[in-house]
């Protein structure tokens, strides 16, 4: 299992939002590149980066910063936020991003999404962001009008390589992961699943471990590793030994 430390970028700094609210911001670092390098020193095997400005505006806003992160790390980077056309996706992959996380495009423009998956096989994942199973889009501010389970056959057919599932009600709230929902999701798809939202303690990491055999690839952690309720190095050590 991989624990992906999150570097969420807004206005050029590293922040965390509570439940995706743009006005519920906590700044954790003024230097996202240094923060990314720190997580690598702590044993990270993969970095999760989100361009929050891009997610809310629909266009890339922190390209140079993200390019710098990729160039200064030896571990791979996955990126989401504001990637809504093939040109933007290509630009990021050429800049060194290993794989991309697509949200709105996958829900609203399936033809372009399928074209993107065909152009970059194995590198395009889908972000499924939900409240009570109902998907949200456009930076979590709009109801997508479809459930998580309804969309799965469509994204599989389009050629998606993996799923990141966020329980919005738990994101940034440090309330623990929804193991039952994740288990059900893993059982409904052949794609690897990454959990996001609610990973708050080492106990949450331990609770997710049994799902690895069902298709869970790992979990994204943000708020918890910045506030210290989850010691990232300790979590990595536990995973290595179990």
UniProtKB/Swiss-Prot annotation:
It is found in: Cytoplasm. Keywords: Amino-acid biosynthesis, Cytoplasm, Histidine biosynthesis, Isomerase. The keyword Amino-acid biosynthesis applies. GO terms for molecular function: 1-(5-phosphoribosyl)-5-[(5-phosphoribosylamino)methylideneamino]imidazole-4-carboxamide isomerase activity. Its EC number is 5.3.1.16. GO terms for cellular component: cytoplasm. The active site is at residues 8, 129. It is an enzyme of class 5 (isomerase). GO terms for biological process: L-histidine biosynthetic process; L-tryptophan biosynthetic process. InterPro entries: Aldolase_TIM, His_biosynth, HisA_bact_arch, Isoase_HisA-like, Isoase_HisA-like_bact, RibuloseP-bd_barrel. Pathway: Amino-acid biosynthesis; L-histidine biosynthesis; L-histidine from 5-phospho-alpha-D-ribose 1-diphosphate: step 4/9. Its main location: cytoplasm. It catalyses: 1-(5-phospho-beta-D-ribosyl)-5-[(5-phospho-beta-D-ribosylamino)methylideneamino]imidazole-4-carboxamide = 5-[(5-phospho-1-deoxy-D-ribulos-1-ylimino)methylamino]-1-(5-phospho-beta-D-ribosyl)imidazole-4-carboxamide. The keyword Cytoplasm applies. Belongs to the HisA/HisF family. HAMAP family: HisA. This is 1-(5-phosphoribosyl)-5-[(5-phosphoribosylamino)methylideneamino] imidazole-4-carboxamide isomerase. It comes from Maridesulfovibrio salexigens (strain ATCC 14822 / DSM 2638 / NCIMB 8403 / VKM B-1763). The gene is hisA.
